[in-house]
Amino acid sequence: MNLIIDIGNTTAKVALFNRSEMVEVLTESNQSLDSLEALCSKYRIERGIVATVVDLNERILAELAALPFPLLWLNHETPLPVGNLYETPETLGYDRIAAVVGANEQFPHNDILVIDAGTCITYEFIDSKGQYHGGNISPGMQMRYKALHQFTGRLPLIDSNGRKLPMGRDTETAIRAGVLKGMEYEISGYIEAMKHKYPELLVFLTGGDDFSFDSSVKSAIFADRFLVLKGLNRILNYNNGRI
């Protein structure tokens, strides 16, 4: 059994995999990993992988150090099951490459665009030969709401909970429509441009932000919330024997 620990900017995901099948996944604060003890008692875990985008506090470091099985700490020197053409691998976020690996595992002989809509929106491309070319980074949903509030004098800070109109009828709905429709059109534009260059392109969407697309775009997307976890599990399996 594999233990997958994915520590993000605000939350941590802890998942258990039996080979390539996800058995259980939990989400908790990135300040502690309270579920570890119970999971270790419940399952026979043989190895684990830790991927983090933040500096870990002493409590989490102690919890991880106490685990009775080897851990792989993902970094830019970790061997990957895909080629990496990124010019600065030391600056590449683990979640970006893990999502690509997760998509490639499912369709190893296809050109793939991976879109992760989280704190930022990231666009990653891996070709049909398993070569990761890189990608783009754009502001995420909450970042857009906060920027409109912080960099203007009078626009309020709102969120996506409320009336959603195609065209705003007041300031609140105008901001909400601008953010949500802006994201929709941006993502649709990326897909259209990439499909023009790679006609057989597959598109994966992952991440925590939910938003709608028109039917023609939606039908062309594989939605997979656990793509990063699946990619981390594949990286761990690929490195079995190296830890």
Curated annotation (Swiss-Prot):
Binding residue positions for substrate: 86, 93-96, 171
Residues annotated to bind ATP: 6-13, 119
Cofactor entry: NH4(+); K(+)
Compartment annotation: Cytoplasm
Predominant place of localization: cytoplasm
SUPFAM superfamilies per UniProt: Actin-like ATPase domain
An MF annotation (GO) of this entry: metal ion binding
Claim: Nucleotide-binding is one of the keywords in the record: yes
Cofactor remark from the record: A monovalent cation. Ammonium or potassium.
Gene3D superfamilies reported for this sequence: 3.30.420.40
GO biological process, one term: coenzyme A biosynthetic process
Binding positions for K(+) per the UniProt entry: 116
Name of the protein in its database record: Type III pantothenate kinase
Organism per entry: Bacteroides thetaiotaomicron (strain ATCC 29148 / DSM 2079 / JCM 5827 / CCUG 10774 / NCTC 10582 / VPI-5482 / E50)
Species lineage: Bacteria, Pseudomonadati, Bacteroidota, Bacteroidia, Bacteroidales
